[in-house]
C-alpha cells in the first residue's frame, strides 16, 4: 500500500514538513530538510511539534541516498485523474507569466489568503494528488 503524506514547505526554517495523511502511526520522528537545502545535518533545525514526522508509514525510498522518489512529482486534479501532468513542468509553465520566479510563492499565498478571507476558496486549490513512484501517494494541501 502506498504511503499517504501531506507536505508543507516552511520557508522560514527551510524545512519540508511531512505528515501522514490518514490513520496516525506511532514511531520515531525527525525533521526532513527541504530539497535543495544547503543545510547540513549539523545545522538542521531542532525538532519541534511542527517538524516531527512519524516514520511508521514512510515508503522505503524515503531514506535512500538520492532522496525519496516522491521528489519526482506527477500531479492531477482528483476529478480529472485521466490526465496527469509532470508537476515540475506544470509549475514552470505557471511561472512563465510572472515577472520573477521569486514572486510565485507570495502571489499564490496572496491569492489563497484573499480567497480564504472572502469565503470563496476554490476546492480545486487543495485537491492535487501528487506522486512519483509506486512507493507513495502524496496530497498537497
Curated annotation (Swiss-Prot):
Disordered as annotated region, ranges: 25-52
Gene Ontology CC: host cell mitochondrion; host cell nucleus
UniProt modification remark: A fraction may be phosphorylated in insect cells and HepG2 cells, a human hepatoblastoma cell line. Phosphorylated in vitro by host protein kinase C or mitogen-activated protein kinase. N-acetylated in insect cells.
Stretches for region Mitochondrial targeting sequence: 68-113
Similarity-based family: Belongs to the orthohepadnavirus protein X family.
Keywords: Activation of host NF-kappa-B by virus, Activator, Apoptosis, Host cytoplasm, Host G2/M cell cycle arrest by virus, Host mitochondrion, Host nucleus, Host-virus interaction, Modulation of host cell cycle by virus, Transcription, Transcription regulation
Subcellular location field: Host cytoplasm; Host nucleus; Host mitochondrion
Protein name listed in UniProt: Protein X
Keyword Transcription regulation recorded: yes
Subunit structure: May form homodimer. May interact with host CEBPA, CFLAR, CREB1, DDB1, E4F1, HBXIP, HSPD1/HSP60, NFKBIA, POLR2E and SMAD4. Interacts with host SMC5-SMC6 complex and induces its degradation. Interacts with host TRPC4AP; leading to prevent ubiquitination of TRPC4AP. Interacts with host PLSCR1; this interaction promotes ubiquitination and degradation of HBx and impairs HBx-mediated cell proliferation.
Organism for this UniProt entry: Woodchuck hepatitis B virus (isolate 2) (WHV)
Statement: the UniProt record of this protein carries the keyword Electron transport: no
GO biological processes: DNA-templated transcription; symbiont-mediated activation of host NF-kappaB cascade; symbiont-mediated arrest of host cell cycle during G2/M transition; viral genome replication
Function summary: Multifunctional protein that plays a role in silencing host antiviral defenses and promoting viral transcription. Does not seem to be essential for HBV infection. May be directly involved in development of cirrhosis and liver cancer (hepatocellular carcinoma). Most of cytosolic activities involve modulation of cytosolic calcium. The effect on apoptosis is controversial depending on the cell types in which the studies have been conducted. May induce apoptosis by localizing in mitochondria and causing loss of mitochondrial membrane potential.
First-listed, main subcellular location of the protein, grouped into a coarse class: host cell
Amino acid at each position: 500500500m502506498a504511503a499517504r503524506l501531506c507536505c508543507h514547505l516552511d520557508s522560514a526554517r527551510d524545512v519540508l514538513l511531512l505528515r501522514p495523511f490518514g490513520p496516525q502511526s506511532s514511531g520515531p520522528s525527525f525533521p526532513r530538510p527541504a530539497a535543495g537545502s544547503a543545510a547540513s545535518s549539523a545545522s538542521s533545525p531542532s525538532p519541534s511539534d511542527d517538524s516531527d514526522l512519524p516514520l511508521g508509514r514512510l515508503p522505503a525510498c524515503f531514506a535512500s541516498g538520492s532522496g525519496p522518489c516522491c521528489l519526482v512529482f506527477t500531479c492531477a486534479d482528483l476529478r480529472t485523474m485521466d490526465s496527469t501532468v509532470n508537476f515540475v513542468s506544470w509549475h514552470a509553465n505557471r511561472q512563465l507569466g510572472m515577472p520573477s520566479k521569486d514572486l510565485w510563492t507570495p502571489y499564490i499565498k496572496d491569492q489563497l489568503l484573499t480567497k480564504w478571507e472572502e469565503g470563496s476558496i476554490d476546492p480545486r486549490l487543495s485537491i492535487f494528488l501528487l506522486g512519483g513512484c509506486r512507493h507513495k501517494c502524496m496530497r498537497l494541501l
